[in-house]
């Protein structure tokens, strides 16, 4: 398995200079950029984005993806302003020379049946994918608690409908554990669609996040299966 290591440097520090120091100290040359200098990358001005890009370039660090919050609004919220944020994120991804964006499939009302909102979810995701396709951008869907794609069956429905050059899957061990989803079952269901891994683990007992391999995510087993499959994407440390 030939993989590249990346990670969320805003868990080192909020400031870009400290993030870069931490990454270089770990021998890392990629970052999945989320928060930087006080807010998510997609909310910065063009001038600030250019400054961030130059600083990263000067230090030999590249983006593996934009760790955006896109799709992290209620499915009942107004989509129009959110879609404008999405278009801005696509623009920034190209400015950063990394047209790859982590995103989600919308929070659902508490204790609701995902099927009840499937039509609206798919309509919104379809608009994202159409725009991404027209603008040569890859969207990476992350399984996450309380969204439509929290469990493997719903993630597979999304992939069966939208998977392609512009829509692929992130596999997050801890998020599946925290949702009560068996990760081995999820992996077998989604393995054909996975392009990116979030290396994070959790305990079923209390849902606490623990170092990879110390929880119930079957991290070692799944990474071995990925290796055997020829996976060559990013492993992102979180």
Predicted regions: what they are:
Residues 32-56, 106-112, 207:
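Glycine-rich, proline-tolerant flexible connector loops at the mouths of alpha/beta enzymes
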Residues 5, 30-33, 63-66, 127-216, ...:
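Acidic/histidine-rich catalytic cores of soluble enzymes
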Residues 1-14:
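Boundary/entry segment of secreted carbohydrate-active catalytic domains
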Residues 234-238:
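Short acidic/histidine-rich active-site segments
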Residues 2-5, 22-28:
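A short, Lys/Arg-enriched amphipathic alpha-helix followed by its capping loop at the start of a domain
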């Amino acid at each position: 398995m030939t993989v590249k290591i990346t990670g969320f440097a805003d868990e080192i520090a909020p400031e870009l200079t400290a993030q870069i120091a931490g990454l270089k100290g770990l021998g890392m040359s990629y970052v999945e950029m989320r928060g930087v200098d006080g807010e998510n990358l997609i909310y910065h001005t063009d001038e600030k984005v250019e400054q961030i890009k130059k600083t990263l370039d000067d230090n030999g660090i590249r983006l593996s993806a934009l760790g955006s919050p896109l799709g992290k609004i209620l499915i009942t919220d107004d989509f129009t302003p959110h879609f404008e944020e999405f278009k801005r994120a696509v623009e920034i991804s190209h400015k950063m020379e990394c047209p790859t964006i982590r995103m989600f499939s919308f929070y659902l009302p508490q204790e609701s049946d995902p099927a009840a909102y499937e039509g609206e979810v798919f309509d919104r995701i379809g608009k994202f994918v159409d725009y991404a396709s027209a603008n040569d951008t890859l969207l990476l869907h992350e399984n996450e608690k309380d969204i439509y794609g929290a469990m493997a069956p719903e993630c597979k429905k999304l992939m069966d409908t939208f998977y392609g050059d512009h829509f692929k899957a992130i596999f997050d061990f801890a998020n599946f554990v925290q949702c009560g989803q068996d990760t081995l079952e999820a992996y077998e269901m989604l393995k054909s669609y996975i392009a990116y891994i979030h290396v994070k683990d959790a305990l079923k007992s209390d849902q606490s996040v623990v170092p990879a391999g110390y929880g119930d995510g079957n991290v070692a087993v799944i990474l071995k299966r990925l290796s055997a499959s020829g996976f060559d994407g990013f492993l992102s440390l979180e």
